[in-house]
Amino acid sequence: MNVNEFVTIYSGGNYAAPIWDEYSSYVLELILNGDFTGGTTNWTLGAGVAYGSNNIAFTSSSSNTSNSTPSLDISKMYLVTFDISNYAAGSIHSNLGGTVSGSEHSSNGSKVDYIYTNSSNNIVYLTSTGFSGTIDNVSVTEVGGSVEGRDCTINNIARLIS
């Protein structure tokens, strides 16, 4: 590794970081077993939701499926991502703490929601309305604040991941 190779991150000022010092190495994943490897440990499946092969399948159900996270903080921004495949009908959205929801999703692909919480309820929900499809790779990470002294506002992170 050549420590003389740097990438510049713009965050109100300039910060030069070694290229091996990537932002992603500082992200704390809050979902336990979001890839459903080997089962649904840490998940509570709602009616019409079943474990597939390292994923969960919804069958035209309108229900909540949930995961208790280590902690969600009031007034924080969170990035929620998940993958939909085998979409057939209905819609699904993420919900943090039972009060704030992301967008309704009704197609295959990787989904991204930024959700600002107003509850300290540590439960992440996937709420479906007649949804038929498969969900995998559920992730929740905190956005904003300072990570290892870096300015990680939503705008700066959006620049980093685009």
Predicted regions and their residues:
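Polar, enzyme-active/binding microenvironments
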Residues: 1-162
